[in-house]
A protein has these predicted regions:
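Positively charged, small/polar-rich N-terminal and surface patches that mediate targeting and assembly
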Residues: 1-124
């Protein structure tokens, strides 16, 4: 496995894109990942009861706690990573549009808990 392993992280403010993203990743052979509910820091600070907001502005918003979906997926090589990000960015959503979310990847030095055989299956 001469290539590096990466973790792909996508924070989706628009949850409606999640299923399409998962379908596209699966088509590329990326079948493992973890999805968690998350909240952005700005949202959390705005909803914090201890921070005063002028004129009860907080009450304008019926649902203060909106959640994002954050996807973490280990990807075995740079080629698959680039394809995954390109397909999602080009066919499903544009992370450059305000309010969509963010996507980034980080090289991973050590992976413990996933046997090498399972990492190889990520490509197939």
């Amino acid at each position: 496995m001469g290539d590096r392993i990466y973790i792909l992280v996508m924070v989706l403010n628009k949850e409606e894109y999640l299923d399409d993203i998962l379908d596209k990743l699966a088509e590329l052979g990326v079948t493992g990942g973890t999805i968690i509910d998350s909240t952005g820091m700005a949202e959390q600070l705005f909803c914090n009861e201890r921070i005063p907001i002028v004129g009860g502005l907080r009450q304008i918003f019926e649902q203060c706690r909106t959640s994002n979906k954050t996807l973490f997926s280990i990807i075995e090589n740079k080629e698959t990573l680039n394809k995954a990000q390109k397909v999602v960015q080009g066919e499903i959503c544009d992370f450059n549009d305000p309010g969509i979310g963010i996507s980034f990847s980080v090289p991973v030095e050590n992976v413990i808990g996933i046997p090498t055989d399972n990492l190889n299956q990520l490509k197939s």
